[in-house]
Every structure is written in C-alpha cells, then in structure tokens.
C-alpha cells in the first residue's frame, strides 16, 4: 500500500496531467508539510512546476491588465482607469499570496533540509525567483525589500553553484539566466546583466564536451536563452531612447 507521501506525489502528477495546478500545489504542500527527509528530484520538480503554473497565469494577467491601464490613462478614460486599478490590485493580492506561500515553505522546510549542492542551489534560486516576482509589481519600500531579498538569495545560490556545480549544470545555468534577468528587468542594470549572462554562456561553451546525455537538452536550451537575451539586451542598449515596445527577456522555468 502506498504511503501518504507517495499518494500525494501520485495525485500531484494526476493534477498536472489534468492541468489543475492549484490542486497540484495543494498535493505538493502536503508532501512538504510531512517532510522528514529531503524531497526527491521528482518531488522538487513537481513542486516547482505546480507553483510556476499558478504564478505564471497571474503574472501574464497582470502584464495584460497593466498594459490596458496605461492605454486608458493615455486616452484620459478616468472611469475605466479606476476600475482597472481595482482589478489589478486584486491580481496583485493573489500574486502576493502565492509568492508568500512558497517563500514560507522554502524558509521553513526546504532550504534547511537540502543536503546536496544542486538541491541547495535549486531552492535558493527558487527563493530568488519568487522575490523577483514580488519586485515586478510592488512599489516603494516593498519593491526595494523584495529586490534586496532577490539579490541575497541569488548571490547565496551563485556562491554554492560556482563551487559545487559544473558550468554546464542546468541548475547553475538556470540561475545565471534568471539572475541576469533580475539585473536587467528589476535593477535596470544592463551592463551587469550582460556580463553575468556572457560569463555563464562562455564558461558553459568551454565545458560543453563534458555534458552527459541526460542534461544535454536542458543545458543547451538554457544556453540558447542566455544568448537570445544577450542579443536582445545589446540591441536594446544600442536603440535606447527609441519609442518602441520592447521584447521581454527570457527566463528559465517561466
């Protein structure tokens, strides 16, 4: 007979196939709540996918609504703007709740129970990601605090990754990708973003012959995203000041 942990993991897989990600989160939260040993690679990936989909839908909604709000403001439609602001605030409350949920799990259970280099980097990267999502829409002191927490988590992850993971390791590459996006999108620091992305890409290219079959696809995909962002950011920096809609940066697991 399956243990409660095995049953919840099984049901999380079922929920994923049915694309019912809120329930997938609930099943994986039960696994984490009863945690007596570190999550397996399968379990931590399920947790990540569940939260990625739950947060991703709302981040997309927030971007669309913010864009509509800007258009209505430029047209002077004050009544519409007031309604949209209220609607945007509702989505921001949902985003805050989701981010706080996973951040609490990471701080109370997951980071402390991580025993290997790759799991430590995985969870610290995740912590940085969800603080970054908060920084995307928070303002003032809350935004500053979220950005500082993002930077701290990513730097802690980077220190471990550089010491314990190969330059081609997909988790190390994914961290470099998201960290560079944070520099570009949140801190408005294109030079640091480009330097970090280029260094990660160059180090991985130099080591690419050592890639095993199992991680080849994941690693080369992230390397391509790093290169795409470098191309995009370099182009944006050259065109700075041009009045055009800019293509969003690409991040890992988003």
From Swiss-Prot:
Annotated protein name in UniProt: 14-3-3-like protein RA215
Family matches, as InterPro entries: 14-3-3, 14-3-3_CS, 14-3-3_dom_sf, 14-3-3_domain
Gene Ontology CC terms, in alphabetical order: cytoplasm
A Pfam family matched in the record: 14-3-3
SMART domains: 14_3_3
Any Gene Ontology biological process: signal transduction
Family affiliation: Belongs to the 14-3-3 family.
């Amino acid at each position: 007979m399956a243990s409660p942990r095995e049953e919840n993991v099984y049901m999380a897989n079922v929920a994923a196939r049915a694309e019912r990600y809120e329930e997938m989160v609930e099943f994986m939260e039960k696994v984490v709540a009863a945690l007596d040993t570190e999550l397996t690679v399968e379990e931590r990936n399920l947790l990540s996918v569940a939260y990625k989909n739950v947060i991703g839908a709302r981040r997309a909604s927030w971007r669309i609504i913010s864009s509509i709000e800007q258009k209505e403001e430029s047209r002077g439609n004050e009544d519409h703007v007031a309604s949209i602001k209220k609607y945007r605030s509702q989505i921001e409350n949902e985003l805050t709740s989701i981010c706080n949920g996973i951040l609490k799990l990471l701080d109370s259970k997951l980071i402390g129970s991580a025993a290997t280099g790759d799991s430590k980097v995985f969870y610290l990267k995740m912590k940085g990601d969800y603080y970054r999502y908060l920084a995307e829409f928070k303002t003032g002191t809350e935004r500053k605090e979220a950005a500082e927490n993002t930077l701290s988590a990513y730097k802690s992850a980077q220190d471990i990754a550089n010491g314990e993971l190969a330059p081609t390791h997909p988790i190390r590459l994914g961290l470099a990708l998201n960290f560079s996006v944070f520099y570009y999108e949140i801190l408005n620091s294109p030079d640091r973003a480009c330097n970090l992305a280029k260094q990660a890409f160059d180090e991985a290219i130099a080591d690419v012959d050592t890639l095993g079959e199992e991680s080849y696809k994941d690693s080369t995909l992230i390397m391509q995203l790093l290169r795409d962002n470098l191309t995009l950011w370099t182009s944006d920096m050259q065109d700075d000041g041009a009045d055009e809609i800019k293509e969003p940066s690409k991040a890992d697991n988003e």
